[in-house]
């Protein structure tokens, strides 16, 4: 598929009814009661089956703002279950603060073995629904551009599908070698695949041969959700459940999944009479179950206090909300073209029912849920359940790039691996397991001595070995802004979703014909989603009125009276108006006209309101001044402390944060390296069966399997500066041009693999680079060569064609050092500068975050030394790209010394950064 980008979603207004402005506190009672709120709503889409070919960004120094939409779209939808994610974030912060691992304090409060019980509902759709879509304007195909649409003729009625109507891929006219399919998707099938040890013992897709033994049919026995979570957690976590169904929803799938014209492929806005879209399916499913089985044991599925609602640190207690709701929808998924339903299909996702929904006849609610298609393998269940536990996506969900993670992590494309699609998902990476308390890497701090560590394999880690290595870097202040004057400014903070935070003061407004309150503003506020307000109260703070804000030239910079409020957040925040939003691009001198309040004593405050998911830098304000007829009567440069200002925290739901503080323009960030040993063992055998799509059309799907270079050592870089792995907007950020994200792999073979011969001739792209999932196949540091591979391309306008390139094995790389670059940099081609492979690997940090050169090479990879020293703008200079060449390396080194017998691990030499 050519285009898989994120959707913008809005939270239904009903979710905010009854919302309060205070955060909950721990209750004296031990009885937990979780009340899902708007801050718990999210929607996160399963990774696309086929990798998009991203458009190469323009040359460095171009307009970065032109790419901001991809960031806005994605950051709304890359995170996991917010209630659980807040717990994981707190664990990470405590671990970094104390120097311990999350497992050290998790298991002191709960028993080490937890078994989650999943309510699993198989849902098919009413074959007699006759949902009327006459005149509905929809996307033409799942792959269509947003404006490539089709209006349904009068009399268009939608019904079904029922289960067991997906065609057998073996009967298709064109070769399909990767689609998962069984004859009967029965409750027994799902019970075996999810909740047993043996799994599905009958071979699947008997038209294909198993690559392991050459026999007809693919053997997927033993690869179950239960076994996977037990293996990843080293026995600390398991799942159980029993599939219920098939339940028949009252409507067609189209009612829930229809993609409207103007949307993106994942759009599931549904029928115009269904305001919740796909979210209504969870409600309808439990309604049908409650009606048909009035004695259903709902309480059996409420064993956990997922959010620690009562604040007692005990997560192993009921909280009144079903812990884990798993839905399976009949038919194919929209992510694999939707099958017979096409754009009317549902896209696999994890989400929550906004505000929760009470199960009829009970005092229990549903909130968080995951949904997968009928023909899913175990991988997508494992991936979406990871979101249920609070984990984010690690792939570049914007579709504008391919982050260097791919099949190395379940929370990226690892869910899709196996000899047949999704049959043998790969492990979570070390960071995922660490925050969940399932791995405790050996910790090194700046200034520690160089040491040897015996690191065991990630899957079924041997005794007397370490789970991995964590190398902490010094906590660095990140420069956000320079205060307008002096050393301080007021700052709204950026650590709170659904914030309603203010800083205000009393003001005696002087008499005069032109009274103005001036301030210097510097803000980055999520455009049209989050807002700042300057508000005035004349009744002691009982009521507040938003004021228009003007710049020095007298132009209004707040939302005008006719502002359409496209995301309805001004309404959500209390029917407000006159909000500031967007990005000032630096300091700007603004004012509020207070002439109408002349001679009065008023209260004035700056208020910052945010919604869920994406919270940019926020609002800095400095150098306040009150003038009357041009003369200054009061001023405050924020250098004397609060000086009469008072900060007030608040929330629209149940979130909390630091609120407004006096800030020097910096914030502390945490960065560290992680290293783990991966081997073809257990579920990580799936690393042998990554893939690259050759063609996907007319229901048929052909791939080339790609073997990742295990056994080997993965080196991860975790950077809290970033909230996800959307790469394109951060390419030109400090310290050097290249990939930056929240958690990326250092690619030991970062130079791109490229198509050759006829395949290159048919490839319309400039560099002929292979897709990202193939590029990352050789990322691990290893003692041996990488594996040969074959990659095939379907040429444009030549359906089902195959033009292939073969690549031989490359020499293994045994040592990581932050003295050298691991990013391919720029290349000189036809007299111009271009990204060599813009979304590859990651940029390593430098001492004090100092800028260092960006690598520049010729097309053949040789250094383009004649360009060294060239300033290309934005503070970037071309050179070797090696921080060590400029004395700016932190001094981190991770070196392979020797493998353990059977490749069960490796002895690793770790050099921590200098203090």
Segments from the language model and where they lie:
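Extended, low-complexity, turn-rich repeat/linker tracts enriched in Gly/Pro/Ser/Thr and Asp/Glu
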Residues: 496, 509-511, 522-530, 612-615, ...
């Amino acid at each position: 598929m050519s285009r898989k980008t994120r959707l913008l979603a809005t939270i239904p207004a009903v979710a905010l009814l009854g919302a309060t402005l205070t955060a909950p506190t721990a209750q004296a009672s031990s009885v937990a009661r979780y009340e899902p709120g708007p801050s718990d709503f999210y929607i996160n889409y399963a990774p696309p089956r086929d990798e998009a070919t991203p458009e190469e960004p323009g040359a460095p120094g171009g307009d970065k703002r032109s790419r901001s939409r991809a960031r806005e779209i994605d950051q709304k939808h890359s995170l996991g279950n917010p209630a659980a994610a807040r717990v994981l974030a707190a664990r990470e912060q405590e671990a970094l603060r104390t120097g311990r691992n999350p497992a050290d304090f998790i298991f002191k409060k709960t028993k080490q073995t937890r078994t989650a019980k999943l309510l699993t509902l198989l849902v098919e759709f009413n074959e007699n629904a006759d949902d009327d879509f006459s005149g509905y304007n929809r996307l033409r195909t799942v792959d269509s551009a947003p404006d490539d649409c089709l209006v349904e003729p009068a009399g268009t009625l939608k019904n079904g599908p029922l289960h067991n109507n997906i065609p057998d891929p073996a009967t298709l006219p064109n070769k399909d070698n990767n689609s998962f399919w069984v004859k009967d998707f029965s409750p027994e099938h799902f019970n075996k695949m999810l909740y047993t040890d043996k799994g599905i013992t009958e071979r699947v897709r008997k038209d294909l041969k198993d690559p392991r033994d050459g026999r007809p049919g693919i053997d997927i026995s033993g690869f179950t959700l239960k076994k996977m979570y037990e293996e990843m957690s080293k026995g600390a976590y398991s799942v159980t459940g029993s599939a219920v169904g098939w339940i028949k929803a009252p409507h067609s799938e189209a009612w829930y999944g229809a993609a409207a014209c103007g949307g993106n492929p994942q759009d599931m806005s549904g029928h115009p009479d269904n305001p919740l879209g796909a979210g209504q399916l969870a409600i309808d499913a439990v309604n049908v179950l409650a009606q048909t089985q009035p004695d259903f044991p709902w309480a059996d599925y409420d064993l956990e206090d997922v959010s620690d609602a009562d604040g007692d640190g005990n997560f192993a207690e009921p909280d009144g909300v079903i812990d884990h709701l798993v839905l399976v929808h009949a038919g194919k998924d929209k992510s694999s073209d939707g099958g017979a339903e096409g754009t009317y299909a549902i896209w696999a996702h994890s989400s929550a029912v906004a505000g929760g929904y009470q199960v009829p006849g009970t005092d229990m609610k549903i909130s968080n849920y995951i949904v997968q298609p009928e023909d899913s393998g175990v991988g997508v269940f494992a991936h979406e359940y990871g979101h249920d536990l609070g984990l984010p996506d690690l792939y570049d969900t914007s579709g504008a790039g391919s982050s260097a993670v791919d099949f190395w992590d379940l929370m990226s494309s690892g869910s899709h691996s196996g000899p047949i699609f999704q049959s043998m998902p790969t492990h979570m990476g070390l960071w995922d397991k660490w925050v969940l308390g399932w791995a405790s890497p050996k910790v090194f701090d700046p200034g520690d001595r160089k040491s040897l560590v015996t690191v065991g394999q990630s899957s079924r880690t041997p005794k007397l070995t370490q789970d991995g290595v964590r190398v902490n870097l010094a906590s660095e202040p990140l420069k956000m802004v320079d205060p307008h004057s002096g050393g301080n400014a007021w700052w709204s903070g950026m650590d709170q979703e659904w914030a309603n935070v203010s800083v205000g003061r009393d003001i005696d407004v002087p008499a005069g014909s032109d009274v103005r309150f001036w301030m210097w503003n510097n803000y980055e506020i999520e455009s049209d989603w989050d807002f700042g307000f300057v508000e005035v109260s004349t009744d002691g703070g009982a009521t507040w009125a938003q004021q228009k804000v003007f710049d020095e030239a007298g132009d209004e910079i707040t939302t005008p009276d006719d502002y359409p409020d496209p995301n309805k957040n001004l309404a959500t925040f209390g029917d407000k108006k006159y909000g500031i939003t967007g990005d000032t691009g630096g300091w700007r001198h603004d004012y509020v006209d207070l002439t109408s309040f002349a001679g009065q004593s008023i209260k004035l405050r700056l208020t910052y309101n945010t919604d869920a998911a994406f919270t940019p830098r926020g609002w800095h304000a400095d150098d306040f001044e009150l003038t009357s007829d041009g003369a200054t009567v009061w001023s405050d440069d924020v250098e004397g402390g609060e000086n009469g200002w008072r900060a007030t925290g608040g929330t629209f739901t149940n979130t909390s944060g630091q609120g407004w503080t006096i800030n020097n323009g910096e914030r502390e960030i945490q960065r560290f390296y992680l290293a783990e040993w991966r081997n073809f063992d257990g579920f990580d055998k799936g690393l042998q069966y990554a893939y690259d799509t050759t063609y996907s059309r007319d229901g048929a799907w052909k791939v080339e399997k790609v073997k990742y270079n295990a056994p080997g050592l993965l080196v991860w870089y975790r950077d809290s500066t970033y909230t996800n792995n959307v790469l394109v907007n951060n390419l030109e950020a400090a310290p050097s041009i290249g990939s930056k994200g929240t958690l990326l792999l250092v690619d030991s073979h970062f130079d791109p693999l490229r198509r050759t011969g006829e395949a290159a001739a048919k490839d319309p792209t400039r560099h002929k680079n292979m897709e990202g999932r193939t590029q990352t196949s050789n990322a691990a540091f290893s003692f041996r060569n990488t594996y040969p591979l074959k990659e095939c391309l379907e040429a444009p306008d030549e359906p089902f064609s195959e033009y292939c390139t073969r690549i031989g094995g490359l020499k293994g790389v045994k040592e990581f050092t932050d003295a050298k670059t691991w990013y391919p940099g720029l290349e000189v081609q036809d007299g111009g500068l271009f990204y060599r492979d813009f979304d590859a690997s990651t940029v390593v940090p430098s001492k004090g975050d100092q800028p260092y050169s960006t690598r520049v090479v010729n097309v053949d990879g040789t250094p383009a030394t004649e360009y060294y020293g060239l300033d290309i703008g934005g503070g970037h200079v071309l050179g070797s790209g090696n921080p060590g060449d400029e004395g700016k390396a932190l001094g981190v080194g991770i070196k392979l010394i020797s493998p353990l017998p059977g490749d069960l691990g490796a002895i690793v030499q770790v050099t921590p950064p200098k203090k």
